[in-house]
Amino acid sequence: LTTLPMALCFFLQCGSFRNDSEGIYVHDRMYQVPLRKDIWDAAKEVNARNGMVIAGTGGGKSAFTLNLTQQLIEQDYTVVVVEFGKSFSQLCRLYPDISLHVDYDEDGVGINPFDLQGEELDNGSIEMLSGVVQKYWRHMFTKDESEKEVALTRFIQDYYENVREGHNFESFYNHVTEHYPEILARKHIPKDFLLESFSLNCGEFLPGRRYENVCKDTGTDFSGKEFIVFELTQIKQDRFLSNLVMGMIFTVIQKKLLSDRRKRGVLIFDEYGETAQMVDTATGTGIHSSVAFCYQKI
């Protein structure tokens, strides 16, 4: 004999699944018939839209995710994928007009966070660019270095006030190093700003230097693309570079998925176990916290 609640735990009774009014098609797990499920949930009947695909090796994770992604593309979702491998490259070829496959090779990444695409420089853009420069610098300012962070933001403001076109990191670097005394006077910045440290570390991203491909302008236009795939296999062994590129990817995610709440957007991390192991070399924090922030905002 046992209690009724305990007995009901072992009582197998399943009702039939019901189709939603919109959504993607999956299989009914009992009868294997097509079933339409609304994973966006515009009415917010479920607290979170996030989900995970979990299976063993060869269990069909990539196949299911590709099928899911194709349906989302067909339904005019904006989809950003970060992957280790080339699972999504073929899908990009099926939709060449709206797709972009970004691979780190000799042609560069093609992400230019300094290109504001015609928008005004606001506080959000300044904060984002300050974070990018600090990553290049390998010097993330602490709470005790607020004056240095303020100085950097004023350099960024001065750059956009005096350079009207062709915005990129190389141009910003040259503006700071070539007009340093004038900027100090214009923006009332103390002379103890670490210019030598800035020019030495950030100089590694200029043409002919070690990380030139990170900032190389490839003319890539993200604005008209609704399906963007970032392939990180070639750089996963370089901890600094992989974290740096991930930070730049987050700027794209911000612009494509988080800036307009009216858009339906999905962020997919394929083989997330690889991503979760990344640690920000500047702060010592895991990438997982940044990923969680993005999913929280979608």
Language-model-derived ranges and their functions:
Residues 31-45:
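Pre-Walker A adenine-sensing motif
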Residues 64:
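Hydrophobic positions on the alpha1 helix immediately C-terminal to the Walker A/P-loop
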Residues 5-35, 84-296:
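P-loop NTPase motor domains
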Residues 53:
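Hydrophobic anchor at the beta1->P-loop junction of P-loop NTPases
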